[in-house]
UniProtKB/Swiss-Prot annotation:
Mg(2+) 2 binds at residues 27, 141. It comes from Shouchella clausii (strain KSM-K16). Gene3D superfamilies: DHBP synthase, GTP cyclohydrolase II. Keywords: GTP-binding, Hydrolase, Lyase, Magnesium, Manganese, Metal-binding, Multifunctional enzyme, Nucleotide-binding, Riboflavin biosynthesis, Zinc. This is Riboflavin biosynthesis protein RibBA. It holds the Pfam family DHBP_synthase. Its EC number is 4.1.99.12, 3.5.4.25. Mg(2+) 1 binds at residue 27. Residues 200-397 are annotated as: GTP cyclohydrolase II. The keyword Metal-binding applies. CDD domains: GTP_cyclohydro2. GO terms for cellular component: cytosol. GO terms for molecular function: 3,4-dihydroxy-2-butanone-4-phosphate synthase activity; GTP binding; GTP cyclohydrolase II activity; magnesium ion binding; manganese ion binding; zinc ion binding.
Length: 397
C-alpha cells in the first residue's frame, strides 16, 4: 500500500515529488510534497492542477523568525495547531500568483541568505512554521516537509499542497493510491516517517534514576530531559517493565492545581492517585509524568481559562477564546521515554481516544484501554461532560 521512506528520500533528492498521508484519526489527508529549493513552475502547476488545495511552504522556526514572518493571527483556533504566518510574494514578482512567480517565492523562502525585505506582505504563498523536533513532536504535514528536507541534506523547507478529488472532497488513501500510481509518486505515511526517525535519532536522555518510596509503595523514579524543548519528565516505574509482556501505563499531564492543591475543578488529582494505586496493586507498571500543564497551555493560561469558565464558558470554549486548541498536548516525547524503558506493548490507563492515537502513531502497541474514571463531584461535573461531548473522552456519566 505504501512506499518506504528511503524511496521517498530518493525521489525528493532527484527533484521529484511525493505524496504524504497523516493518521486517519488526525486530518486523514494527503499532501503533495516537494523540496522548496527545487520548486519549479512545473511543481507549482502540478500541485495546483492535481492537488487543488492551498500551496504552503513549511519552514523552520529559525528561518521564519529571521525573515520576520509574523503569525497570520494572534489567536489561532485551529484544532491541529497549524502555524500559518502572514502570506508573502517575492519582491521581484508582479501579481505573484502565476506558477512561475510562486515558484520563485517558494525558493526564496528556503534561501538562508534571504532577507525580510525580499518579500511583500500579504501575498500568494503561505509559509507554515514547523515545530522544532519535527514529526517526533507534532505528527503533521508541516513537520514532515521540513524533516524530509533535512533527511535529503537540503535546505530545511518544503512546499506542500492538500489533495482533493475532482468533486472537491478530500482524497483519502484509496484515491491517493490511484493518484500516486498515475503519476509515479511514492506514497508514504507520517507514521512511517516517525518510525524512520525513531530508528535513527533519539531526542530524550535518561539523566538519573532513584528509589522513591511513596504512600502507595516503592517506585523507581527515572528523570528525563529532551533536546526539543528542554523540558523534564519523570517516569515512576514499578517492577520489571522491559520483559516483553504488556505493561500497565498511565501518561499523566502535570496539573498543579489538581495533583498538589486538590482542586475539585478537574479529576486530575484523583486520576493520578488512582493510577499509582492500580500500578502498585499489579506490582508492575509505569506512570509517566509529563510537563503539559493545562492540556499544554501552561499554568497561567490555565488560570485564564478558569476565569473564562467562571464567566460561563466550558473548558473547550475557554481554550479557544484564549487562542489555543482544545488540546495542545503531543505525545512524541512520552513515546520515546516509554521505548527507552523497554516498553513496546501496553495496557493504557486512559479515557482519552486522542492519547491512544497519539501514542500508537509513535509505533507503540496498545493492547488494551483500561478505563480510569473518577466519580464526578458538583464542581467538575460540567467539565467532565464537556470532555465527553466535545473531546470524545470515554466516560460514563
Amino acid at each position: 500500500m505504501f512506499e518506504s521512506i528511503d524511496e521517498a528520500i530518493t525521489q525528493l533528492k532527484a527533484g521529484g515529488m511525493i505524496l504524504v498521508v497523516d493518521d486517519e484519526d488526525r486530518e486523514n489527508e494527503g499532501d503533495f510534497l516537494a523540496l522548496a529549493e527545487t520548486a519549479s513552475p512545473e511543481t507549482i502547476n502540478f500541485m495546483a492542477t492535481h492537488g487543488r488545495g492551498l500551496i504552503c511552504v513549511p519552514l523552520t522556526e529559525e528561518q521564519a523568525e529571521r525573515l520576520q514572518l509574523g503569525q497570520m493571527v494572534s489567536h489561532s483556533t485551529d484544532p491541529h495547531g497549524t502555524a500559518f504566518t502572514v502570506s508573502v510574494d517575492h519582491s521581484h514578482t508582479t501579481t505573484g500568483i502565476s506558477a512561475f512567480e510562486r515558484a520563485e517565492t517558494v525558493r526564496a523562502l528556503a534561501d538562508a541568505n534571504a532577507q525580510p525585505s525580499d518579500f511583500k506582505r500579504p501575498g500568494h504563498v503561505f509559509p507554515l512554521v514547523a515545530k522544532n523536533g519535527g514529526v517526533l513532536r507534532r505528527a503533521g504535514h508541516t513537520e514532515a516537509a521540513v524533516d524530509f528536507a533535512k533527511l535529503c541534506g537540503a535546505k530545511p523547507a518544503g512546499v506542500i499542497c492538500e489533495v482533493m478529488n475532482e468533486d472537491g472532497s478530500m482524497a483519502r488513501v484509496p484515491e491517493l493510491r490511484i493518484i500516486a500510481d498515475q503519476h509515479n509518486l511514492p506514497l508514504v505515511t507520517i507514521k512511517d516517517l516517525i518510525a524512520y526517525r525513531r530508528k535513527t535519532e533519539k531526542v530524550v536522555t535518561r539523566e538519573v534514576a532513584i528509589s522513591l518510596p511513596t504512600e502507595y509503595g516503592d517506585f523507581k523514579a527515572v528523570g528525563y530531559t529532551n533536546t526539543i524543548d528542554g523540558k523534564e519528565s519523570v517516569a515512576l516505574v514499578k517492577g520489571d517493565v522491559g520483559n516483553g509482556e504488556p505493561v500497565l501505563v498511565r501518561v499523566h499531564s502535570e496539573c498543579l492545581t489538581g495533583d498538589v492543591f486538590g482542586s475539585k475543578r478537574c479529576d486530575c488529582g484523583p486520576q493520578l492517585h488512582a493510577a499509582l494505586k492500580q500500578i502498585e496493586a499489579e506490582g508492575r507498571g509505569v506512570l509517566l509524568y509529563m510537563k503539559q500543564e493545562g492540556r499544554g497551555i501552561g499554568l497561567i493560561n490555565k488560570f485564564r481559562a478558569y476565569k473564562l469558565q467562571e464567566e460561563g464558558y466550558d473548558t473547550v470554549e475557554a481554550n479557544e477564546r484564549l487562542g489555543f486548541p482544545a488540546d495542545l498536548r503531543e505525545y512524541g516525547i512520552g513515546a520515546q521515554i516509554l521505548r527507552d524503558l523497554g516498553i513496546r506493548d501496553m495496557r493504557l490507563l486512559t479515557n482519552n481516544p486522542r492519547k491512544i492515537a497519539g501514542l500508537e502513531g509513535y509505533d507503540l502497541n496498545i493492547v488494551e484501554r483500561v478505563p480510569l474514571q473518577m466519580e464526578a463531584v458538583a464542581e467538575n461535573e460540567r467539565y467532565l461532560h464537556t470532555k465527553r461531548e466535545k473531546l470524545g473522552h470515554m466516560l460514563n456519566l
